């Protein structure tokens, strides 16, 4: 046989061996005999209008639980103001789909009320018991190690580079270094994020989530669009779920988690969610692993979802949820007194939506009322790269205009892209801050 042919054959065999070795090495990183599954489930909102967020998280808990992840390795963070809320006619109950089961029973109350905040979340995720206890937390954390798989499900409002909590923001630039440090410190074998929030794709975009640290993330929306609520319930007078969350959980409820891969679940969720663009980030090879490697491997009785309505049919943008709920309630008002009360609340909601004018004033002042630039700032949606400027101006706006209640004002958050544009246009941070202070002094809405 000619030498050149022998060399070619040797190279081909070597390549096959290397590819096979890489393939085997990747899949041998599943939790071994000592490896464990951990889950951190977070609903970052409060208030009955946000019923759906805690419903999503409670449903996620039930999935993890029935597939064998024990309570000591499931951490739940939610304000817990829904199940027994005065507006909830079915006390002690939370459902995530029309006529669905009560998903509230058994859910651990690990972190509730004011303990649902960004700092607590980051410390819990990193397994920092002492730091958590120093903030009067329970001490229950994700105590994962190098052989473990960690699943994080976050549900709330969002904005460019931001995830909301009841009173504060979690910035992508706070989450990213924590995740990178966890990878460096061997705090997991694999880490998976499922994130339900508006503009959630911006949390992992660019170099915020590298593709070589064993982390995989999927998000409900891209970096520039809203996520959607679904399943308005006439009896409960609120939305029961969010489209992306409902889609992946209804899939997990009915399939064999030990055969379906994360990539397959992503594809199903992406296809079925036609209200926003479901995205994936990070190490996409992790998608070849089964869903059970992160949501639990024990077999469970499949749920028949064939009679559940399509969540896309009544889907509404997250920022329009409160307005939509009030309009639905107004249609069903039983008395003039009830109708008047709802109309008064509607007026307040409309006033809140008018906060866009506040943003316009900030922009106009910051660019010296140059009409072209002002229009451009409201037309473009630039990728966020100037994180330092952006974080500074967002936090300053929250401080000087507390009346906006920004962390829970989803409509105002939809216009944070204007602040992104200012920073990306290299407008000096101090100029933007000064403009905010001037507008805040002239705007009654900004006062508490």
What are the functions of these language-model segments?
Residues 3-448:
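Cysteine endopeptidase catalytic domains of the caspase/legumain-like
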């Amino acid at each position: 046989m000619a030498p050149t042919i022998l060399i070619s054959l040797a190279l081909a065999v070597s390549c096959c061996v290397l590819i096979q070795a890489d393939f085997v090495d990747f899949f041998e990183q599943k939790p071994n005999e000592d490896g464990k599954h951990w889950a951190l489930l977070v609903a970052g909102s409060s208030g009955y209008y946000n019923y759906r967020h805690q419903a999503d998280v409670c449903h996620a808990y039930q999935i993890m639980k029935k597939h064998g992840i024990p309570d000591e390795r499931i951490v739940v963070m939610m304000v817990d103001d829904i199940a027994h809320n005065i507006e909830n006619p079915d006390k002690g109950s939370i459902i995530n789909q029309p006529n669905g089961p009560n998903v509230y029973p058994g859910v651990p109350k690990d972190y509730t009320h004011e303990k649902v905040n960004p700092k607590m979340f980051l410390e819990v995720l990193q397994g920092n018991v002492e730091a958590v206890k120093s903030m009067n937390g329970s001490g229950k954390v994700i105590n994962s190690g190098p052989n473990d798989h960690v699943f994080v499900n976050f549900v709330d409002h969002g904005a460019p580079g931001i995830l909301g909590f009841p009173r504060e923001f979690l910035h992508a630039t706070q989450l990213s270094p924590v995740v990178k440090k966890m990878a460096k410190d061997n705090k997991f074998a694999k880490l998976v994020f499922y994130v339900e929030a508006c503009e959630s794709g911006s949390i992992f975009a660019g170099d915020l989530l590298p593709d070589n640290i064993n982390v995989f993330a999927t998000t409900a929306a891209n970096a520039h669009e809203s996520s959607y609520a679904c399943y308005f319930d006439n009896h409960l007078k609120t939305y029961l779920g969010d489209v992306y969350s409902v889609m992946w959980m209804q899939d997990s409820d009915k399939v064999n988690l030990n055969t379906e891969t994360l990539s397959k679940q992503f594809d199903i969720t992406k296809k079925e969610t036609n209200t926003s663009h479901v995205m994936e980030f990070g190490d996409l090879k992790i998608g070849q692993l089964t869903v059970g490697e992160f949501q639990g491997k024990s077999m469970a009785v499949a749920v028949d979802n064939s009679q559940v309505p399509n969540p896309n049919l009544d889907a509404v943008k997250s920022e329009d949820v409160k307005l939509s709920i009030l309009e639905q309630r107004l249609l069903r008002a039983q008395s003039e007194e009830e109708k008047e009360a709802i109309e008064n609340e509607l007026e307040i909601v409309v006033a809140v939506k008018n906060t866009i004018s506040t943003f316009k004033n900030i922009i106009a002042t910051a660019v010296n009322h140059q009409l072209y630039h002002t229009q451009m700032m409201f037309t473009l949606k630039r990728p966020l790269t100037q994180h330092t400027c952006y974080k500074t101006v967002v936090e300053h706006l929250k401080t000087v205009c507390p009346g906006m209640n920004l962390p829970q004002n989803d409509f105002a958050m939809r216009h944070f892209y204007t602040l992104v544009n200012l920073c990306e246009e290299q407008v000096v941070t101090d100029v933007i801050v000064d403009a905010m202070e001037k507008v805040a002094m002239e705007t009654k809405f900004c006062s508490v």
